[in-house]
Amino acid sequence: MSWQDKIAQGLQRRRDAAAYRTRQVNEGANGRWLQSGERQYLNFSSNDYLGLSQNDEVIAAWQQGARRYGVGSGGSGHVTGYSQPHARLEQQLADWLGYPRALLFISGYAANQAVLTALTDADDRILADKLSHASLLEAAAHSPAQLRRFQHNQPEALQNLLIKPCQGQTLVVTEGVFSMDGDSAPLAALQQQTSAAGGWLLVDDAHGIGVHGEGGRGSCWLQGVQPELLVVTFGKAFGLSGAAVLCQEPVAEYLLQYARHLIYSTAMPPAQACALQAALRQVQQGDALRQQLQQRIRQFRTAAAHLPLQLGASKTAIQPLLVGDNQQSLIWAEQLRAAGLWVTAIRPPTVPPGSARLRITLSAAHQPEDIDRLLEVLYGLCH
């Protein structure tokens, strides 16, 4: 088989399964609205949970940072790319979340890959929730450690793995809020079991930070848990991009020595770190935004419970409507788009086979009439 045949067959498999991914060129796609071509859509696919991507203070901080520091960092943080804005942001994050240290990464994907590959050796094991994000499962699979996956959000399933002997160290991996189902992990139970077995817990709270907990401190704070490793990302509630790993002092120093994704990547622009400091202030002062988001979630769930579709058991901004069939989910997403509503159909392999869904994400930027319009069209599609 030639390279051309290999590529053609792989593409055809995705087409045959109605799982072919495409990208859409948009003029703007954050907060409440999405502009595509000549048409404006109500955006129910963004992770901009608090609408901060359009916040005037955050935008101004980026602009001011760019004027002072330029638009790039100029190198790895280990060479010339680590500046005062980076150091200030790391300290502010550490103080806010109650950890001695924070390390910045260019993305949540890079942070997860770096931590799992840097910390583990061949005699270690990683025990991961089976529905963990692709960045976690891929990193675990490529790490030198043995990977075992436990049933989603089932502490007893984790316990059955923990009681088995391990020559090295054990790292338990989960998410605070799961990105496709919107449900939350039982973090207190997972931490108790992990600690009792002498292991460490890593929580990726990409979808919880900024939204849950006192002052937006996230899922771990909400559940009274402090994992040994906390990954927070800035592409959701913070409205920007990038990530940080929160940990103890020796762990941070270890990652600075061994985390290749950190050592060999150009650091985020200082201007971005300035904008993230402004976003952090907005998150810390964002109780009204979080309350508004919770109102939108309650409004949607109250009415969506009467739809003839399975509504996920989510109390978060991620509200999945299970369709099942790949092609049907695409048809409904297109019909919603025709009605001026941007909702994404999520299909395998992103989710398990037979669980294609309309993944609806809500934002504090949405107005009550936006939710009403979405529900009106959904009722029309189902009846």
Curated annotation (Swiss-Prot):
Instruction: Set out the biological process GO terms recorded for this chain's protein.
Output: biotin biosynthetic process
- Known catalytic reactions: 6-carboxyhexanoyl-[ACP] + L-alanine + H(+) = (8S)-8-amino-7-oxononanoate + holo-[ACP] + CO2
Is Transferase included in the keywords of this UniProt record?
Answer: yes
Instruction: List every position bearing N6-(pyridoxal phosphate)lysine.
Output: K236
The highest taxon in the source lineage is: Bacteria
The entry's pyridoxal 5'-phosphate-binding residues are: G108, Y109, S179, H207, T233
Its top-level enzyme class, in one word, is: transferase
A GO MF annotation of the entry reads: pyridoxal phosphate binding
As cofactor, the record names: pyridoxal 5'-phosphate
Q: Which residues bind substrate?
A: R21, H133, T350
Enzyme Commission code(s) on record: 2.3.1.47
Give the matching PROSITE patterns.
Answer: AA_TRANSFER_CLASS_2
Which Pfam families is this protein grouped with?
Aminotran_1_2
Q: SUPFAM superfamilies, alphabetically?
A: PLP-dependent transferases
UniProt pathway = Cofactor biosynthesis; biotin biosynthesis
Sorted keywords for this record are:
Biotin biosynthesis, Pyridoxal phosphate, Transferase
Q: What is the annotated quaternary arrangement, including any partners? A: Homodimer.
NCBIfam families hit by this protein? bioF
- Main function: Catalyzes the decarboxylative condensation of pimeloyl-[acyl-carrier protein] and L-alanine to produce 8-amino-7-oxononanoate (AON), [acyl-carrier protein], and carbon dioxide.
Per the similarity annotation, which family is this?
Belongs to the class-II pyridoxal-phosphate-dependent aminotransferase family. BioF subfamily.
Q: What is this protein called?
A: 8-amino-7-oxononanoate synthase
Q: Which organism is it from?
A: Yersinia pestis
